[in-house]
Amino acid sequence: MNKVLSLVFVQFLFFGLTVSAQTISPIIVECGKKCRGEFSIINNGLTPLAVTVEARSFSLDTLGHAINRSLDPGVDLRLEEGSARISPRGTHTFAYQLKCSAPPCSIALLSSMVVGHTAEGILVRIQLAHTVYACEKQKDCRKQVRAAAGVAVN
């Protein structure tokens, strides 16, 4: 019985150390046509992580799925950093300033990172999105954008 428990403990320890996920916080932000904000990437892994941030404008289809495109001409976005190296179990905060000349503006800040590779050697890259909705007024901005796209608003 002790041998079985020891084996279970070793498996738990092994899988507990190898299974990890990167996280982003906050996921969604609503603001006025001018805003400052920041988001954090947390590396829950045991190896350093290189992260790059790409800004994209997006619109929503009637099902609420995002359709990404390059930044709209009326969007002035300034990222303090476009990339970073995050230490194991570390956190990095990216700050930005956004001005939207023709609200509403919907922006996705896509953080890309390579988290491993397949048995065939293909790199596995993930993207985590920090979404910014900018309207004339901050209150219910996301609901306004979703309603304008024809998405059912709760």
Language-model segment annotations:
Residues 17-23:
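Sec/Tat signal peptide C-region and signal peptidase I cleavage site
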Residues 69-102:
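Intrinsically disordered, low-complexity Pro/Gly/Ser/Thr-rich segments with frequent PxxP/GP/PP motifs
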Residues 99-144:
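Terminal connector regions
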